[in-house]
Amino acid sequence: CDLLARYSIRNDMALKVLIRKLAESVKQPSSFTRLANLVSSTGKKITTDTIIDYLNYLEDTWIMFSLENYASKLADKVSNKKYYFMDNGILSLFLMDPETSLLENLVAVTLKKRYGDDLYFYHRNIEVDFYLDEGHKAIQVSYSLKDPETRKREVNALLKLAENVAVDDLCIITRDEEEMIVEGEKTIRV
């Protein structure tokens, strides 16, 4: 692998385990410490500093990119990010139930290309998949809203965010559903 040679990586198994663990948690924030513990729990000992190096290598080679939590303090912005794969084909190699993860990853890649470093996720008592401060836009991703519990969770997250942050554009991206959800004074595009 070019990555191994380029950065003289000696612990290639730890890197492979890290990539697998990132794929398995593609929709969740991951701290450096959590990732180091996950990799170490497989018997591949690794330090937090090495995890940081490997993550930087993965981003420098455009295998992955990260998003910061808009709502967190500076230290947490740096150490607790969401990681996405630049190529859904690579991500799909690691997933058992890929639909929602692949859809969210595809949306992340598309938004990252369009908005660059202005793209965040939002997590403070509410979890919203994507947040754009400049456009006051919040986006949730769900494979489908046909399940009433899923629909309620996704809609409520956006409405709660709109109560706490200036958001003009609320959107839920699904695989193939389209509608307008009106809740009070807020409209959510699906």
Model-identified regions with their sequence ranges:
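Short, charged, amphipathic alpha-helix that recurs within catalytic cores of restriction-modification
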Residues: 151-164
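Domain-level recognition of nuclease-like catalytic cores that cleave nucleotide substrates
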Residues: 176-190
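Short beta-strand-loop-alpha-helix junction that forms the active-site gateway
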Residues: 135, 141-150
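Hydrophobic/aromatic beta-strand patches that form the interior of the parallel beta-sheet core
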Residues: 84, 139, 171-173, 189
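Hydrophobic, well-ordered secondary-structure elements that form the walls
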Residues: 111, 139, 158, 170
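Short active-site-adjacent structural elements
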Residues: 128, 147-150, 179-183
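Short, hydrophobic beta-strand segments that form beta-sheet elements in well-ordered domains
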Residues: 121-122, 168-174
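Accessory nucleic acid-recognition modules appended to NTPase machines
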Residues: 1-138
